[in-house]
Regions:
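Feature captures the catalytic cores and cofactor-binding loops of soluble hydro-lyases/lyases
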Residues: 3, 7-15, 24-136
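Phosphate/diphosphate-binding glycine-rich loops and adjacent basic-rich segments that engage nucleotide
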Residues: 137-146
């Protein structure tokens, strides 16, 4: 167990902001058709976490999956509070990035996105459902135990 406030990992900030929530290590997910935008529930019946919710969680996801429409769904989820508080990934995810950017531009709501090196990503994912705080600046970001 990591002490509250202790740094867990550092990475490259893809989108600035701060987000705190219980981590949800998850396989690739499409927000378009894979998640109910109203409550954040995973509705993709083929997904390992079917029935879980992304609402208020720190998604620890290697990369997204799906169409460009997923950006619109993510932006709407951030607006209505059914989206994740932060996304931690191991690869630059343009679709998720566009969704987070749209949420800030249109609604003034932020969802930080942090890219980690593969080893750091696997270490964070292995922590499981623990409270995390993700803080992203313009270039760098960090994850701390919450």
């Amino acid at each position: 167990m990591t002490a509250s406030g202790a740094e867990v990992a550092r990475g490259r900030a893809l989108h600035p902001g701060d987000g705190t929530g219980v981590a949800l290590p998850i396989g690739p997910l499409s927000f378009w058709g894979g998640v109910d935008w109203r409550d954040g529930r995973i509705i993709d019946v083929h997904h390992d976490q079917h029935g879980e919710t992304v609402a208020g969680r720190v998604l620890v996801m290697p990369h997204g999956r799906g169409s460009s429409s997923a950006a619109v769904v993510l932006a709407e989820m951030i607006r209505n509070g059914s989206g994740p508080t932060a996304v931690v990934t191991r690869s630059t995810e343009v679709i998720l990035l566009v969704g987070a950017m749209a949420a800030v531009e249109l609604y003034g709501r932020s969802c930080p996105i942090l890219e980690l090196e593969p080893d750091d990503f696997e270490r964070v994912a292995a922590l499981g459902a623990v409270p995390l705080h993700v803080a992203c600046g313009d270039d760098a970001g960090s994850i701390r135990a919450a």
